[in-house]
Amino acid sequence: MKEANSNIAPYRIQQGMVALELGATDNKILEFFDYLTGQVPTGCVYFLHVLPEFDVLSGILGREGEQVISNYEINDEVVARMEREIRSRMNHRDGMHVQFDVKEGNPLEQLLEDAKDVRADLIVIGQKSGVNKHGILAKNLARKAKANTLIIPDKATAGIRRMIVPIDFSKNSVKALRTAISLNESLEEPAEIVVLNIYEMPNLSVYKIQRTREQFEKMLQRDHEEAMDAFLNTQVPGYRDTLTTQLVMQKTPGIAQYIMDYATEEGGDLIVMGAKGHSKVELLLLGSVTEKVLAMNEHIPTLVVK
């Protein structure tokens, strides 16, 4: 790990919580998380699998319910199998305390409750691709959790060589960018951090301007370049030269699509995005752009920063 810059400390996971389904999607979760804990100092990790509520299963399945329930019985054997599978896929890390548990209940409610109980500062969850209601649990968890949430699609690959950080110059953007820099400080081989701003071309018909469209586009780009430099020099002083900036003018609706297209075409390994705060109103919306990125993303891990 390289020496820390005095402004932003290297990233550290004090208490991680990893949600597992005990199925195929766990492979990519454990693969990426094993890479991450090999780079980032990690204190404690709590692995949790939530079974559906048995009384609900019984009502749906009737007489066959008891047999199904017996197959999902919460006992030491299930936890032991879970532990064996995790340890077989992850390397041992000195100083990292690991705990395993299996609980019954509503998956979202149980994950949120346990994340609060263990005071998780990072929640990790997988996301299936190509299914109906794509990423609903992951999206809702990212929306309601108070901790940073890492969503790992089942087509993801382990490794971070290029981080994409979409910004809109808001406070949430600052948190996301500082987190990306902090994470980069912990990597043995620093990644390229691309600070991405998607900006919209105004409707020129409502303005009385004495410029051609081409002249206006150049002026708009210059203004955003200056805004980007001012933002970086103010919010992350000393790091400007370590960051790559990219401005993209939005010509069609859908900022999230622009973000995904750029991240895919440019080989992004991790998207780091800001989210809304924790007030009752803000908890209702994670942020439309962030939610849409999560919904359409099937291959790039996304870290939602709170």
Language model features: what each stretch is:
Residues 1-11, 35-37, 52, 69, ...:
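Structural beta-alpha unit
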Residues 2-68, 162-217, 221, 233-241, ...:
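Small/aliphatic-rich secondary-structure junction motif
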Residues 29, 107-108, 134, 176, ...:
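Amphipathic coiled-coil/heptad-repeat helices and related helical stalk/stem segments
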Residues 72-87, 221-233:
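Short, surface-exposed alpha-helical segments at coil->helix boundaries
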